[in-house]
UniProtKB/Swiss-Prot annotation:
Expressed by the venom gland. It is found in: Secreted. GO terms for biological process: defense response to bacterium; defense response to fungus; killing of cells of another organism. The modification Leucine amide is found at residue 18. Coiled coil: none annotated. This is M-lycotoxin-Ls3b. Belongs to the cationic peptide 04 (cupiennin) family. 05 subfamily. The keyword Electron transport does not apply. GO terms for cellular component: extracellular region. Keywords: Amidation, Antibiotic, Antimicrobial, Fungicide, Secreted. Inhibits growth of Gram-positive (S.aureus, B.subtilis) and Gram-negative (E.coli, P.aeruginosa) bacteria and fungi (C.albicans). Disulfide bonds: none annotated. Its main location: secreted. It comes from Lycosa singoriensis (Wolf spider).
């Protein structure tokens, strides 16, 4: 669902930030 996509996006951004 959208929540999974949202969490995946956050993880992706976090990975790039850290």
């Amino acid at each position: 669902g959208r929540l999974q996509a949202f969490l995946a996006k956050m993880k992706e951004i976090a990975a790039q930030t850290l």
